[in-house]
Amino acid sequence: MRLFDLILDVIFPPSRREKAVQELTVEDFFVHPHTFALNDTNITSLLSYKDKNVQNLIRTLKYSGSFTAASLCAKILEDFLTEEIAELETLSDKSVIITSVPLGKKRKQERGFNQTALILKELHKMLPHIEISDEILIRTKETKPQTTLSRKERLENVANAFELTKRGKALPKNTFVILIDDVTTVGATLYFASRPLTENGIQVLPLAIAHG
Protein backbone atom coordinates (compact mmCIF):
# COMPACT_ATOMS: atom_id res chain seq x y z
CA MET A 1 0.00 0.00 0.00
CA ARG A 2 2.91 2.38 0.69
CA LEU A 3 4.13 2.04 -2.92
CA PHE A 4 0.64 2.99 -4.14
CA ASP A 5 0.70 6.00 -1.79
CA LEU A 6 4.08 7.23 -3.03
CA ILE A 7 3.01 6.92 -6.65
CA LEU A 8 -0.23 8.75 -5.89
CA ASP A 9 1.63 11.63 -4.26
CA VAL A 10 3.56 12.15 -7.51
CA ILE A 11 0.64 11.69 -9.90
CA PHE A 12 -2.02 13.30 -7.72
CA PRO A 13 -0.71 16.02 -5.39
CA PRO A 14 -3.17 16.47 -2.51
CA SER A 15 -5.02 19.45 -3.99
CA ARG A 16 -5.55 17.66 -7.30
CA ARG A 17 -6.51 14.48 -5.49
CA GLU A 18 -9.11 16.30 -3.41
CA LYS A 19 -10.56 17.85 -6.55
CA ALA A 20 -10.74 14.41 -8.18
CA VAL A 21 -12.63 13.04 -5.17
CA GLN A 22 -15.10 15.92 -5.28
CA GLU A 23 -16.10 14.79 -8.77
CA LEU A 24 -16.79 11.18 -7.70
CA THR A 25 -20.13 9.60 -6.85
CA VAL A 26 -20.98 6.26 -5.26
CA GLU A 27 -21.49 4.85 -8.75
CA ASP A 28 -17.76 5.31 -9.40
CA PHE A 29 -16.92 2.59 -6.86
CA PHE A 30 -17.21 -1.16 -7.28
CA VAL A 31 -18.52 -2.38 -3.94
CA HIS A 32 -17.59 -6.02 -3.55
CA PRO A 33 -17.80 -7.23 0.07
CA HIS A 34 -14.83 -9.42 0.91
CA THR A 35 -14.46 -11.39 4.15
CA PHE A 36 -11.27 -12.95 5.44
CA ALA A 37 -10.33 -14.52 8.77
CA LEU A 38 -7.64 -13.48 11.20
CA ASN A 39 -7.44 -16.12 13.91
CA ASP A 40 -11.04 -16.51 15.12
CA THR A 41 -12.29 -13.19 13.73
CA ASN A 42 -13.96 -12.60 10.35
CA ILE A 43 -13.15 -9.18 8.92
CA THR A 44 -15.15 -7.65 6.08
CA SER A 45 -14.14 -4.95 3.60
CA LEU A 46 -16.18 -3.29 0.86
CA LEU A 47 -13.69 -1.86 -1.66
CA SER A 48 -10.31 -2.81 -3.12
CA TYR A 49 -7.50 -0.37 -2.37
CA LYS A 50 -5.97 -1.29 -5.73
CA ASP A 51 -8.62 0.86 -7.40
CA LYS A 52 -7.34 4.39 -8.14
CA ASN A 53 -10.60 6.03 -7.05
CA VAL A 54 -10.46 4.16 -3.74
CA GLN A 55 -6.84 5.21 -3.15
CA ASN A 56 -7.76 8.85 -3.75
CA LEU A 57 -10.83 8.54 -1.52
CA ILE A 58 -8.99 7.01 1.44
CA ARG A 59 -5.99 9.33 1.30
CA THR A 60 -8.15 12.44 0.95
CA LEU A 61 -10.16 11.30 3.95
CA LYS A 62 -7.18 10.26 6.04
CA TYR A 63 -4.86 13.18 5.46
CA SER A 64 -7.19 16.06 4.57
CA GLY A 65 -10.28 15.27 6.64
CA SER A 66 -12.36 15.84 3.52
CA PHE A 67 -16.11 16.22 4.10
CA THR A 68 -16.74 14.94 0.57
CA ALA A 69 -14.64 11.83 1.17
CA ALA A 70 -16.30 11.16 4.53
CA SER A 71 -19.74 11.55 2.98
CA LEU A 72 -18.89 9.16 0.12
CA CYS A 73 -17.57 6.56 2.58
CA ALA A 74 -20.72 6.94 4.67
CA LYS A 75 -22.93 6.43 1.64
CA ILE A 76 -21.03 3.29 0.66
CA LEU A 77 -21.46 2.00 4.21
CA GLU A 78 -25.14 2.95 4.30
CA ASP A 79 -25.97 0.86 1.25
CA PHE A 80 -24.24 -2.19 2.76
CA LEU A 81 -25.35 -1.74 6.37
CA THR A 82 -29.02 -1.08 5.63
CA GLU A 83 -29.40 -4.62 4.35
CA GLU A 84 -27.19 -6.15 7.05
CA ILE A 85 -29.03 -4.41 9.89
CA ALA A 86 -32.47 -5.21 8.47
CA GLU A 87 -31.57 -8.91 8.33
CA LEU A 88 -30.13 -8.81 11.85
CA GLU A 89 -33.24 -7.14 13.27
CA THR A 90 -35.47 -9.67 11.52
CA LEU A 91 -33.59 -12.76 12.68
CA SER A 92 -32.56 -11.74 16.21
CA ASP A 93 -33.23 -9.45 19.15
CA LYS A 94 -29.82 -7.79 18.84
CA SER A 95 -29.46 -4.08 19.50
CA VAL A 96 -27.09 -2.48 16.98
CA ILE A 97 -24.43 0.10 17.79
CA ILE A 98 -21.97 1.45 15.23
CA THR A 99 -18.59 2.66 16.43
CA SER A 100 -15.15 3.31 14.98
CA VAL A 101 -11.57 2.32 15.74
CA PRO A 102 -10.25 5.00 18.10
CA LEU A 103 -7.23 7.03 17.08
CA GLY A 104 -4.32 7.59 19.45
CA LYS A 105 -4.19 11.01 21.14
CA LYS A 106 -0.86 11.91 19.51
CA ARG A 107 -2.04 10.97 16.02
CA LYS A 108 -5.31 12.84 16.50
CA GLN A 109 -3.44 15.95 17.64
CA GLU A 110 -1.19 15.75 14.58
CA ARG A 111 -4.10 15.41 12.15
CA GLY A 112 -6.68 17.39 14.07
CA PHE A 113 -9.37 14.77 13.47
CA ASN A 114 -10.20 11.06 13.50
CA GLN A 115 -11.07 10.11 9.94
CA THR A 116 -13.40 7.27 10.90
CA ALA A 117 -15.25 9.54 13.32
CA LEU A 118 -15.87 11.88 10.37
CA ILE A 119 -17.44 8.97 8.49
CA LEU A 120 -19.69 8.10 11.42
CA LYS A 121 -20.84 11.70 11.73
CA GLU A 122 -22.08 11.56 8.14
CA LEU A 123 -23.44 8.03 8.55
CA HIS A 124 -25.58 9.15 11.48
CA LYS A 125 -27.43 11.53 9.13
CA MET A 126 -28.20 8.60 6.83
CA LEU A 127 -29.10 6.05 9.54
CA PRO A 128 -30.65 8.21 12.28
CA HIS A 129 -32.50 5.26 13.81
CA ILE A 130 -29.24 3.39 14.56
CA GLU A 131 -27.17 4.30 17.61
CA ILE A 132 -23.71 5.57 16.68
CA SER A 133 -21.17 6.16 19.43
CA ASP A 134 -17.44 6.83 19.71
CA GLU A 135 -17.49 6.11 23.45
CA ILE A 136 -17.17 2.31 23.30
CA LEU A 137 -13.42 1.81 22.91
CA ILE A 138 -10.27 3.69 23.83
CA ARG A 139 -6.73 3.27 22.52
CA THR A 140 -4.47 2.69 25.49
CA LYS A 141 -1.10 2.98 23.78
CA GLU A 142 0.38 4.96 20.93
CA THR A 143 1.27 2.77 17.96
CA LYS A 144 3.47 3.19 14.91
CA PRO A 145 1.86 3.77 11.49
CA GLN A 146 1.06 0.33 10.08
CA THR A 147 1.95 1.08 6.45
CA THR A 148 5.69 0.40 6.72
CA LEU A 149 5.46 -2.69 8.93
CA SER A 150 5.56 -6.39 8.08
CA ARG A 151 2.61 -8.65 8.89
CA LYS A 152 4.24 -9.81 12.13
CA GLU A 153 5.15 -6.25 13.10
CA ARG A 154 1.60 -5.04 12.40
CA LEU A 155 0.16 -7.65 14.74
CA GLU A 156 2.69 -6.87 17.47
CA ASN A 157 2.23 -3.12 17.01
CA VAL A 158 -1.47 -3.04 17.88
CA ALA A 159 -1.63 -6.02 20.26
CA ASN A 160 -3.37 -4.99 23.49
CA ALA A 161 -3.73 -1.41 22.24
CA PHE A 162 -7.47 -1.15 22.95
CA GLU A 163 -9.75 -1.34 25.98
CA LEU A 164 -13.43 -0.88 26.66
CA THR A 165 -14.62 2.39 28.13
CA LYS A 166 -17.00 2.42 31.08
CA ARG A 167 -19.82 2.65 28.54
CA GLY A 168 -18.38 -0.26 26.56
CA LYS A 169 -18.15 -2.46 29.64
CA ALA A 170 -21.81 -1.78 30.41
CA LEU A 171 -23.14 -2.85 27.00
CA PRO A 172 -25.93 -5.45 27.26
CA LYS A 173 -24.97 -8.90 26.00
CA ASN A 174 -27.53 -8.67 23.20
CA THR A 175 -25.62 -5.73 21.66
CA PHE A 176 -24.26 -6.16 18.14
CA VAL A 177 -21.36 -3.78 17.48
CA ILE A 178 -20.37 -2.76 13.96
CA LEU A 179 -16.76 -1.62 14.23
CA ILE A 180 -15.61 0.65 11.39
CA ASP A 181 -12.11 1.39 10.11
CA ASP A 182 -11.08 3.12 6.89
CA VAL A 183 -8.64 0.59 5.46
CA THR A 184 -7.27 -2.81 6.48
CA THR A 185 -4.40 -4.90 5.16
CA VAL A 186 -3.81 -7.93 7.37
CA GLY A 187 -6.70 -7.05 9.69
CA ALA A 188 -4.55 -6.43 12.77
CA THR A 189 -6.16 -3.19 13.95
CA LEU A 190 -9.74 -4.41 13.55
CA TYR A 191 -8.87 -7.74 15.14
CA PHE A 192 -7.32 -6.27 18.27
CA ALA A 193 -9.95 -3.51 18.53
CA SER A 194 -12.65 -6.21 18.41
CA ARG A 195 -11.13 -8.39 21.11
CA PRO A 196 -12.15 -6.37 24.20
CA LEU A 197 -15.74 -6.53 22.96
CA THR A 198 -15.79 -10.22 22.11
CA GLU A 199 -14.05 -11.07 25.38
CA ASN A 200 -16.91 -9.24 27.11
CA GLY A 201 -19.48 -11.38 25.31
CA ILE A 202 -20.41 -8.84 22.63
CA GLN A 203 -20.84 -9.88 19.00
CA VAL A 204 -18.86 -7.71 16.58
CA LEU A 205 -18.76 -7.10 12.83
CA PRO A 206 -15.30 -5.65 12.05
CA LEU A 207 -15.77 -3.67 8.84
CA ALA A 208 -13.30 -1.70 6.71
CA ILE A 209 -14.10 0.61 3.83
CA ALA A 210 -11.17 -0.78 1.83
CA HIS A 211 -8.79 -3.72 1.82
CA GLY A 212 -5.36 -3.74 0.25
Language-model regions, residue ranges each:
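Glycine-rich phosphate/pyrophosphate-handling loop used in enzymes and phosphotransfer proteins
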Residues: 1-212
